[in-house]
Amino acid sequence: MSMHPIVDKGEVAIDFPDKYYSGGFGRDCSFEARAEDEGVLIRLVRGGSDKRAVAIHLHHFLFAGIIEELARSLGEREPIDAVHRDPLLAAARGLAAALERSVPKPAG
């Protein structure tokens, strides 16, 4: 597990019929994001006296659908400012490059 500091913030909310959970993860927290055989894992962790952790596993087709919907949504709104756009663009290019170089060879 490779944890990284959160340089911005994240918020999580889970709404069950009889319970509601929410929590924030800021600069004093950390995250993990990794590719797995069946999809991706994203973990947010907060230490200290208010300890909490959340993990989400997204299978590849769901993750692809989420990325596609984000792309559509970004295309329909005003452009994001350069301070936020540049790291998002660099990360998206890195993801694309990693996917293109790791195409498995057909069996047989």
Where are these regions (language model features)?
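Positively charged, low-complexity terminal tracts
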Residues: 1-108
